[in-house]
């Protein structure tokens, strides 16, 4: 797939993103009914997780080095959540659960972490030391292109919720044994920022992308855009909304 140029003013400008031409075509065609639920949608149905006005070949597929579990707050508005974008772009590696449903987390079989800030949270670069502390690292071999690469974790849990609703999930006893990982401070490009929140509060799809990028940089070879297409929809919508703001004189 060819790459689309992004606005230079955007933090998304250097991404290696598949062509947005199918999204441009779908936008011109307008909203359509979701074939599953019948609701009017554009690009995808955020309730059903189905493509709308697009064919599977129009959308890039991303292979991830770890499995991603997203626990969505039941009161999180579907239309404001970016979690479904991860599922559409990496369907083999991403699963979404609506709380109180959570995944089976067997720490005896897998190294699992929860991405959430806190006083005891570690950084991505500290993962290897943490999971190898007993001198017997449990490591799953991950194949990338022609190489077998080592990764200290196999599963990552994210919470999809506004910050003022996270306590209900983060305090669940089923998650208490999971070590926490905190991302480096980065500014969000999300256009639906929570009122009163700092610009370092990332959308779920941004958090997943930055975590995987950091993981790759620390434990694999040089990062060359392997997960950039996770922001395929996000970068297009960001560009679209910025254009609309500029046209309205609000940018």
From Swiss-Prot:
SMART domains on file: DTW (SM01144)
Catalysed reaction equations from the record: a uridine in tRNA + S-adenosyl-L-methionine = a 3-[(3S)-3-amino-3-carboxypropyl]uridine in tRNA + S-methyl-5'-thioadenosine + H(+)
Top-tier EC class: transferase
A Pfam family this chain is assigned to: DTW
GO molecular function: tRNA-uridine aminocarboxypropyltransferase activity
EC number of the protein: 2.5.1.25
GO biological process, one term: tRNA modification
PANTHER family referenced in this protein's UniProt entry, alphabetically: NATURAL KILLER CELL-SPECIFIC ANTIGEN KLIP1 (PTHR15627), TRNA-URIDINE AMINOCARBOXYPROPYLTRANSFERASE 1 (PTHR15627:SF8)
The keyword tRNA processing appears for this protein: yes
Similarity-based family: Belongs to the TDD superfamily. DTWD1 family.
Alphabetized UniProt keyword annotations: Nucleus, S-adenosyl-L-methionine, Transferase, tRNA processing
GO cellular component terms, A-Z: nucleus
Entry protein name: tRNA-uridine aminocarboxypropyltransferase 1
Motif DXTW in this chain: 160-163
S-S pairs: none
Function description: Catalyzes the formation of 3-(3-amino-3-carboxypropyl)uridine (acp3U) at position 20 in the D-loop of several cytoplasmic tRNAs (acp3U(20)).
Main location: nucleus
InterPro entries in the record: DTW, tRNA_Mod/Golgi_Maint
Species whose genome carries this gene: Danio rerio
Location in or out of the cell: Nucleus
């Amino acid at each position: 797939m060819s790459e689309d140029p992004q606005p230079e003013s955007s933090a998304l400008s250097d991404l290696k993103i598949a062509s947005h031409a199918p999204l441009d075509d779908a936008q011109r065609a307008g909203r359509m009914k979701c074939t599953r639920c019948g609701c009017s949608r554009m690009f995808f149905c955020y309730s059903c997780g189905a493509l709308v006005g697009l064919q599977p070949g129009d959308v890039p597929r991303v292979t991830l080095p770890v499995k991603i579990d997203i626990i969505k707050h039941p009161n999180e508005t579907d239309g404001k959540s970016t979690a479904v974008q991860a599922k559409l772009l990496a369907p083999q590696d991403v699963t979404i659960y609506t709380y109180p449903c959570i995944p089976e987390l067997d720490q005896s079989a897998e190294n699992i972490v929860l991405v959430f800030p806190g006083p005891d949270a570690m950084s991505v670069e500290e993962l290897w030391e943490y999971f190898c502390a007993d001198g017997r690292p449990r490591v799953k071999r991950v194949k990338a292109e022609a190489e077998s690469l080592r990764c200290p974790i196999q599963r990552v849990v994210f919470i999809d919720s506004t910050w003022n609703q996270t306590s209900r999930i983060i305090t669940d006893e089923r998650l208490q044994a999971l070590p926490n990982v905190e991302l480096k401070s980065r500014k969000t490009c999300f256009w639906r920022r929570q009122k009163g929140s700092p610009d370092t509060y990332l959308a779920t799809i941004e958090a997943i992308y930055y975590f995987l990028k950091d993981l790759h940089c620390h434990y694999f070879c040089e990062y060359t855009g392997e997960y950039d297409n996770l922001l395929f929809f996000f970068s297009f919508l960001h560009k679209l909304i910025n254009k609309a703001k500029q046209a309205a004189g609000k940018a």
